Amino acid sequence: MHVKKGDKVKVLSGKDRGKEGTVLEAFPKNERVLVEGVNMVQKHAKPSQENPQGGILNIEAPIHVSNVLPVDPKSGEPTRVGYEVKDGKKIRIAKKSGEALDK
């Protein structure tokens, strides 16, 4: 998968097209990611220990990984991902600038 938890991404399609956010969680088996502030849905929650009031909550729902691209650290634009081997480790690089995406 071309995005990981903590990556800054831009949404390419769907109702939240153009929005940017951070990947909160990645689900590689389902090819989906949870992006902060994107694809908000309303969840009707019963009263519980954590939420004694209950009611309607706004939470993020996962979106398909093909609808997001990482943001280039140099230019701030969405970029495709390439891979290089440095010091025996495979790292992700931004195709637009050649900058490393992995910290």
Curated annotation (Swiss-Prot):
Keywords: Ribonucleoprotein, Ribosomal protein, RNA-binding, rRNA-binding. It comes from the Bacteria. The keyword Ion transport does not apply. The keyword Transcription regulation does not apply. InterPro entries: KOW, Rib_uL2_dom2, Ribosomal_uL24, Ribosomal_uL24_CS, Ribosomal_uL24_KOW, Translation_prot_SH3-like_sf. CDD domains: KOW_RPL26. One of its GO terms (molecular function) is rRNA binding. SMART domains: KOW. One of its GO terms (cellular component) is ribosome. GO terms for biological process: translation. Belongs to the universal ribosomal protein uL24 family. One of two assembly initiator proteins, it binds directly to the 5'-end of the 23S rRNA, where it nucleates assembly of the 50S subunit. One of the proteins that surrounds the polypeptide exit tunnel on the outside of the subunit. PANTHER family: MITOCHONDRIAL RIBOSOMAL PROTEIN L24 (PTHR12903). Part of the 50S ribosomal subunit. This is Large ribosomal subunit protein uL24.
